Amino acid sequence: MNLDTFDEHPPYRLIPSQDLYRIQLARSRPGHRPIGQLRVAPAGARSGRFCQPDQRVAYFADSPETAGYEAFGRREQEWLSLDFLRRREVVWAQPGKELSLLDLTLHAAEWPVLQATRFAETQALSRAVKWHAEGRVVISGNRTIVLA
C-alpha cells in the first residue's frame, strides 16, 4: 500500500445535515462509558475493522440498511436470534460540524482489505492513515463512515 496516493484525492466532506446511522447495543456494557447517546467500545477493544488501541472508534453508515449489513452481514452471521436483535437499536445522528474525511472508496478495488473482515490488516491501515483526516470513509455497498 502506498499511502502517498491519498494525497492525490480530495477529502470527503461530511456536512452537518448528512444523516448517519449505526446499530449498537441498547444498553452499555459494564465499564463502557457512552458518549452522549452513542455506545462505543472503549479504546483498545479491537472489536471493529478500524479500531485502535488508543482511540474509541464509531462506525456509521449512510443508510439503515448499510448499518445493518456492517453490524450483522459483514460478520458473516448465518442466523440471528430475536433476543440478539432486541438487545440492539438503530441510532440516527448528524455531525455537529463539517468533517474532512479520508475517502478510501477509490482504493477498494486495488486494496481488497477495505472490503474484508481481515481485522489485523484494516487496523494496521487505520493506524497508518489516521493523521490524514478526522475520519475515514470506506466502501461497503454504500458508504460506511468511520470516526475516531
Where are these regions (language model features)?
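Active-site and NAD+-binding cores of ADP-ribose-processing enzymes
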Residues: 1-45, 49-51, 75-148
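Extended catalytic/binding region for NAD+/ADP-ribose chemistry, centered on the ART fold
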Residues: 47-78
